[in-house]
């Protein structure tokens, strides 16, 4: 996938968040699902709705990370009982390790601790993280999508 397409998709994920249409996990998942030709119906975004703000406001795993792992599952996850899950697990770990290296933590409350919750600075931090993770997930997909 070319850098122009990645940048456009990042901008779309950030816009969904900035316009308050979706939060981190939902924005990222929606953009990747659409990019892949919607292997699952758009309504499946509901599955990502509990992940924002670190698992339902708990401040734990960042929603951009969990949404990214869900999005990778669209391409690498298994769809039948008993199928091999090794690639999906490896891709999830790869994204997790990259995220930790990139941001210093996978914990939402650590990533936003410098900002007042709900402030414009907090929003921009989360939008930036969502965009950056969207880019990484797109780079982890096969070249043909």
Please give the residue ranges for each predicted region.
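Polybasic, low-complexity association/targeting segments
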Residues: 1-19
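Acidic-glycine-rich active-site phosphate/pyrophosphate-binding loop
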Residues: 1-5, 32-50, 104-111
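Structural signal for hydrophobic packing residues in well-ordered secondary-structure cores
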Residues: 17, 21, 32-36, 55, ...
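Active-site nucleophilic cysteine motif
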Residues: 21-25, 62
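Phosphate-handling active-site elements
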Residues: 35-46, 72-91
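Helix-adjacent hinge/juxtasegments
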Residues: 50-83
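C-terminal binding/interaction regions
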Residues: 87-145
């Amino acid at each position: 996938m070319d850098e122009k397409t990645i940048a456009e998709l990042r901008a779309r994920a950030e816009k969904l968040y900035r316009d308050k249409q979706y939060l981190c996990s939902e924005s990222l998942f929606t953009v990747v699902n659409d990019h892949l030709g919607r292997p699952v119906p758009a309504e499946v975004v509901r599955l990502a709705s509990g992940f924002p703000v670190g698992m339902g406001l708990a401040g734990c795993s960042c929603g951009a990370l969990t949404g990214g792992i869900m999005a990778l599952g669209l391409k690498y996850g298994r769809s039948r009982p008993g199928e091999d899950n090794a690639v999906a697990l490896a891709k999830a770990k790869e994204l997790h390790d990259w995220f930790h290296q990139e941001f210093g933590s996978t914990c939402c409350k650590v990533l936003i601790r410098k900002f007042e919750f709900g402030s414009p600075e907090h929003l921009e931090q989360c939008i930036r993280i969502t965009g950056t993770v969207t880019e990484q997930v797109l780079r982890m997909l096969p070249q043909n999508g």
